[in-house]
């Protein structure tokens, strides 16, 4: 192992602010109900539809990421503007498939039944898989389990649906009747494609929340630039130290 690798320190946890979206507050960091890892707020936005000329908001969505997402994404995407990232399909695919934990908090603005919510989510997931040519029996069974988890649930305004996506591909589902986040989930589905598709259906190319997509792009653009600047300062300090030692 080289001396530079031996001296490398873990990336600092990103310092971010909370976000207020349509009277819903997303705190700067949360503990994942799947792993208890701290995750930072990557972005937030609304999901709504234009109904008879009026934009109706159904849910407000926050996306949280593990701290190592920033250096991982920085390798390819640092220096890109918010606009460039927002328009980049590969960038959001890398977030969706990246080897770091993700967490999604979906807070209700209007009441929804579990059946209404889960059927729409799985419909979007299946559309993504078919587009990618990835729909198999395993995914069909994962969809059945997903629908079963939600079948008897109802979600009044202010309640939340929570998803934790592990780097290994499991999807942990949890529910909250208020703003709290439970320490553990109520069910785990071991299907990597389903876990990824749930997130992609929100922030991907045809995702249901363009506002969340824009928010994630804006925040990560800033964080990657900050990470780049800090790394350059750190590298310069190491070079100075080595020069003095020699």
From Swiss-Prot:
Stated family: Belongs to the chalcone isomerase family.
Q: What is this protein called?
A: Chalcone--flavanone isomerase 1
- Please provide, in alphabetical order, the Gene Ontology terms of the cellular component aspect for this entry: chloroplast; cytosol; endoplasmic reticulum; extrinsic component of endoplasmic reticulum membrane; nucleus; plant-type vacuole membrane
Q: Which GO terms describe its molecular function?
A: chalcone isomerase activity
Gene label? CHI1
Keywords from the UniProt entry: Flavonoid biosynthesis, Isomerase
Q: Which residues form a coiled coil?
A: none
Could you tell me which PANTHER family the record lists for this protein? CHALCONE--FLAVANONE ISOMERASE 1-RELATED, CHALCONE--FLAVONONE ISOMERASE 1-RELATED
Q: Which GO terms describe its biological process?
A: flavonoid biosynthetic process; response to auxin; response to UV; response to UV-B
Q: What class of enzyme is it?
A: isomerase
Site (Important for catalytic activity) residue list:
117
Specify the superkingdom: Eukaryota
- Has the keyword Isomerase been applied to this entry? yes
Function, as annotated, reads: Catalyzes the intramolecular cyclization of bicyclic chalcones into tricyclic (S)-flavanones. Responsible for the isomerization of 4,2',4',6'-tetrahydroxychalcone (also termed chalcone) into naringenin.
